[in-house]
A protein has these predicted regions:
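Conserved N-terminal catalytic core of the sugar/cofactor nucleotidyltransferase
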Residues: 363-364
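Acidic/histidine-rich, metal-coordinating catalytic segments
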Residues: 385
Length: 679
């Protein structure tokens, strides 16, 4: 039995430690994959580990969000081994409750059956899909499954084995239709409650304003929260979900005190058996809907003699780290999930996979900005997929197509230079051409005749392995004055509060639209009940990290002086010295921001979530504004002990980072600062 405390990364690390790392001399390079949904990062990973796209299909790919957990692959000799960690029971129950609620709401609104089923079987975040676990009635009702494919490939040779018998299909369909009937009954009761509430509030349903509809929807949610039939349905579905673990060998499972699986591990010398087994946790193969455990998985780590088919020498020593796509964000200043940014420190290379047909849109630019602000841009490797789709009357020949893509990258670098300085722009531009590769048709097996792509893939591995070449000691020491830090903190915290007041509808800010109250409520539950620091694209912890890091990065870009002398503005040594400190700051900011916004405010987030009844949306928003002001007060504008302590913690964080990174901070010592506070 394992303890209830849950850290999936630590559990996987205990079973199957990652080689490589900052101080390792084992020749391994760690690669973190980052990219937008559908750009092809998992497809590139497939090429690097040599899994067959038609027969093995590991990891799974599709046009939608497919990689919904962390995946780590170690290329090493010996047996094939794997460890899988699972999402805790309480969080799965909440996902189920949100799916059932969405289905009931859609039924009340008069949506057709197909839409009600979709709401029930696919969570709005598209990361939790009950259809994988319980099956899909629309597919189960079909007599011919010939068109059910794992992915969007044109050809599928040697289809994945179907695990489900006709008898089991019938049982799955019967269970789903029972759940849908209960959802319909709950919707009927809720609609009657809605009509009664509307009459009491003198609201005409057909002409209700948005504000009135929100009030009525919240009343329905409150009614369901008190309905025993609603909770009984959720519990029944959760029990059905838990039954899927019975298909696993008990000897390979370890569970928490409540009996819910925490980890599963497996080892074999048989590659085919290993791939078939591990696909139960990562597959999206439609004929096996009803048996797949994919949505319950938090992370997968595998190791074995994987190798690229086209690599002609000894298998490269690689650790490949994949995760959820960064999404299609609308603004390059948007925050990346902490699930992405907290992994930067573990990587030797950070591979940004982008679509060459639409290069350097908002999301990839947000990655570049984050890497520059955090001092990790020297780890960047750019892989442009879909190079075969880059076409135009003015793009004749490979060189012209490359120039077109590189031009987009140069524009992005120049835009970043305007915010972060000429040195940051130059550090990005130095990556061309050595750190940029172009890939065509990598979703298929790469044939010998595809000489261009084979050359680029081989070059990609060479580039990755070059990132572990030892760097000499920093020769220059930047010197800073702590007095110049206050303005940076003021600007960052002011922007943080302005942004979140706009999101909460408590003020207006250009480019920030108020979020629907249901999403705000869901965020407070994630923060309070599950200690998860985000809900979909609502990321208060990541926002605070990004805004503080951006302003502190600009502070660090302009040292007061240097020792022993001032390096030239375009010197790589200058940027290396500053980036070393930025990395230290970025790592510490993750801990500070999570502690102040989440861990010290758990009871406040629970209280904000639990508000019910008319006017609760406004009360919740006011609570959140207060929580944010306590967590990140604006220096000199929000006076009091909270503001003093916050500024002290940031100054201490910067001081530790500067000293650890080889620099010097004037005007700072804990003793002097504490004596000022006491006086």
């Amino acid at each position: 039995m394992l303890p209830d405390t849950h850290d999936g990364w630590a559990i996987r690390e205990d079973v199957l430690p990652l080689p490589g790392g900052k101080d390792a001399n084992d020749g391994y390079a760690r690669v973190q994959f980052v990219g937008t949904t559908g750009a092809g990062k998992t497809t590139v990973l497939r090429q690097l580990i040599g899994t067959d796209p038609n027969k093995e299909r590991f990891p799974s790919i599709s046009a939608a969000k497919t990689t919904i957990c962390d995946i780590e692959v170690i290329l090493q000799e010996g047996n094939f081994s794997g460890v899988v960690t699972f999402i805790p029971r309480a969080r799965i129950r909440q996902y189920i409750a949100e799916c059932v609620l969405a289905a009931i709401t859609s039924s009340i609104e008069g949506m057709v059956e197909r839409d009600v089923i979709r709401k029930f079987l696919e969570h709005s975040e598209q990361r939790f899909r009950l259809s994988y676990i319980l099956g899909n009635p629309l597919l189960l009702r079909e007599s011919d499954n010939a068109e059910l494919l794992d992915e969007e490939d044109e050809e599928v040779q040697g289809e994945e084995e179907s695990l489900i018998s006709q008898e089991e299909r019938d049982d799955l369909l019967a269970a789903l239709e029972k759940y849908l009937a209960q959802i319909a009954e709950l919707a009927k009761v809720s609609h009657a409650h809605l009509a009664q509430a509307a009459a009491e509030l003198d609201i005409e349903l057909g002409k209700a304003s948005k504000q009135d509809r929100d009030i009525l929807q919240e009343l329905v949610e409150d009614q369901l929260a008190e309905d025993d039939h609603f909770h009984s349905l959720i519990d029944a579905i959760l029990d059905d979900v838990e039954l899927r673990f019975s298909y696993l060998n008990d000897s390979e499972l370890e569970c928490s005190r409540d009996g819910w699986p925490i980890k599963w591990s497996f080892s074999t010398s048989d590659r085919d058996q290993f791939i078939r087994t591990i696909n139960r946790f990562s597959s999206n193969y439609a004929p096996n809907y009803g048996r797949l455990l994919t949505p319950l998985v938090e992370g997968i780590r595998v190791a074995g003699p994987f190798a690229p088919e086209w690599w002609e020498t000894e298998s490269p020593r690689l650790v490949l780290m994949d995760g959820q796509g960064i999404g299609h964000i609308a603004d390059s200043s948007s925050s990346l999930s902490t699930s992405v940014t907290r992994r930067f420190k573990f990587a030797d290379a950070i591979m940004l996979v982008d679509n060459a047909a639409q290069p350097m849109q908002a999301a990839p630019c947000a990655v570049l900005q984050s890497l520059v602000a955090s001092g990790h841009e020297s780890k960047l490797v750019l892989a442009f997929t879909h190079f075969d789709e880059v076409k135009g009357d003015n793009l004749i020949g490979t060189a012209a197509r490359k120039d077109h893509i590189v031009g987009s990258f140069d524009n992005a670098a120049r835009a970043i230079g305007k915010s972060f300085g000429r040195e940051s722009e130059l550090s990005l531009l130095r990556l061309n051409p050595d750190r940029i590769v172009f890939l065509s048709n990598v979703q298929k097996r790469v044939e010998a005749k595809a000489r261009f792509t084979l050359f680029e893939l081989n070059r990609l591995i060479d580039v990755i392995m070059s990132t572990i070449t030892p760097v000499g000691p920093v020769q220059y020491r930047p010197i800073y004055d702590v007095a110049n830090l206050v303005l940076a903190v003021q600007k960052a915290t002011q922007e943080f509060h302005d942004r979140w007041r706009g999101i909460l509808g408590m003020g207006s800010r250009s480019g920030v639209a108020p979020e629907h109250w249901t999403r705000i409520k869901a965020l407070t539950r994630r923060l309070g009940n599950f200690q998860i620091d985000e809900y979909d694209a609502l990321r208060p912890v990541a926002d605070l990290i990004r805004l503080l890091q951006t302003q502190i990065s600009q502070f660090l870009n302009s040292p007061l002086s240097w020792s022993p002398e001032i390096p030239s503005d375009d010197s790589e040594d200058r940027q290396v010295a500053i980036d070393t400190i930025k990395k230290e700051v970025f790592d510490r900011l993750h801990e500070l921001s999570r502690t102040r916004v989440l861990e010290e405010k758990v009871s406040g987030w629970v209280e904000a979530y639990e508000h019910r009844g008319t006017g609760s949306t406004r009360i919740r928003a006011r609570d959140m504004v207060r929580l944010y002001e306590e967590a990140a007060p604006i220096p000199n504008e929000m006076p009091g002990p909270d503001a003093n302590e916050f500024l002290f913690e940031l100054r201490e964080l910067i001081a530790q980072s500067v000293i650890e990174g080889g620099g010097e901070l004037l005007g700072w010592s804990r003793t002097n600062y504490e004596s000022v506070i006491e006086s």
